[in-house]
Amino acid sequence: MPVYNAPLLSIDAAEARRYAGLQKAADFNEGKILEACEDTRLLAKPRGIWEIYDYDCETQTINAHPPCLLQGKKIGQHLAGCEKVIALSATVGEDIEEDITRRFSSGEYSSAVLMDAAATAAVEQLADGMEKAISPKMAAQGFLRKWRFSPGYGDWPLEQQPELIRLAKAEQIGVKLTTSMMLTPRKSITALIGLYRKQENSTAEHSPKGCAACTQKNCPSRRK
């Protein structure tokens, strides 16, 4: 199982602003966002891990040991035409979460919210970096990739998080689940990436992703 430990050299302040719901707050102090991004970067302990499996798109089954039957129509549609899937997990560690909690407890609400948003941007950025590292390896084997899809997207139930934790071997980087199926450390993700051969799924790269694929039209973090 490949492990990804590339450092975060910076955190995208525009993404942190978006996650904080400040896209329309043009007069908000940009320096505070940049400060939150830098504080987060210094505390981050970025780690990622991934594993590749054969996939049967007809039955929505990941051929692991034991096999994993994916539930939900949306994930099945998303992985249509895929021969393999990559199960991945990424985290920026616990130190950020502890600092955010400390700031809330001491009444530093604004900085805590901004740091929470920066941490979300950081873990997504980490996962983006993993995808970029994976892509050429898969391309060398004749595969293109779809964008990552996580439990909770569409109708893919959070109840399948334990399966994804197992498939990605996420506990090896310290990512676990609470009894309510939430990831810990909180700024962590799990996801599947579908792999397909272009002649079998020539339009896959044009399928909607992220905010464009989400039904929450009024989300304050929605990309413009």
Residue ranges with predicted function:
Residues 108-168:
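Internal, well-folded beta-alpha domain core
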